[in-house]
């Protein structure tokens, strides 16, 4: 929709209802507008959009079906997995999903540990936000993971790459940097 909101309301109450009925857990990402927002909010379907307008869709042409599309500064390809939260939308190429999940689990458990350590005054924000943690921090985190019930499902996460980077191994550091936005 190229950010069209007025006369660009691709999704409304009817299409949201159809998405819910046909897919159960599907949703929509629209780089444009929606309408019938009150009806949409009553349906348990996630729809990400740029704005709300009461006008119907007009002066739009479908250029491709099941092909690549540009949404903002991102490109979504057929088969990509869509991850959407209140913070934004990610398009994950299907061949990278396992790797992304692994890194997301690591980030999540590091957040649980990091927030706890900040609250206790054990580490500073600079230490928690560092790309490479010290060996002592990583070992303390591994102990924390084993003891804290919030981390139960992360007990088997492999931290060897992070430990190698903490010990100054250049290959590990280079590999670790691939997972950090610069």
Tell where the protein language model's regions lie, with residue ranges.
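Feature captures the catalytic cores and cofactor-binding loops of soluble hydro-lyases/lyases
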Residues: 1-78, 91-182
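Generic structural signal for buried aliphatic residues
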Residues: 82-83
């Amino acid at each position: 929709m190229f950010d069209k909101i007025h006369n660009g309301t691709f999704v409304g109450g009817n299409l949201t209802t159809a998405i819910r009925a046909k897919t159960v857990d599907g949703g929509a990402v629209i780089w444009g507008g929606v309408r019938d927002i009150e009806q949409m909010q009553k349906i348990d379907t996630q729809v990400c959009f740029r704005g709300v307008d009461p006008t119907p869709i007009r002066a739009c042409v479908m250029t491709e079906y099941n092909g690549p599309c540009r949404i903002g500064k991102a490109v979504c390809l057929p088969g990509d997995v869509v991850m959407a939260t209140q913070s934004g939308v990610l398009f994950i190429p299907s061949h990278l999903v396992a790797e992304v999940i692994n890194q997301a689990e690591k980030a999540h458990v590091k957040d649980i540990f990091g927030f706890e350590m900040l609250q206790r005054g054990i580490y500073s924000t600079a230490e928690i936000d560092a790309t490479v943690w010290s060996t002592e921090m990583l070992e303390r985190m591994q102990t924390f993971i084993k003891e804290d019930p919030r981390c139960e499902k992360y007990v088997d996460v492999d931290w060897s790459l992070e430990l190698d980077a903490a010990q100054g191994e250049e290959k590990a550091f280079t590999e670790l940097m691939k997972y950090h936005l610069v």
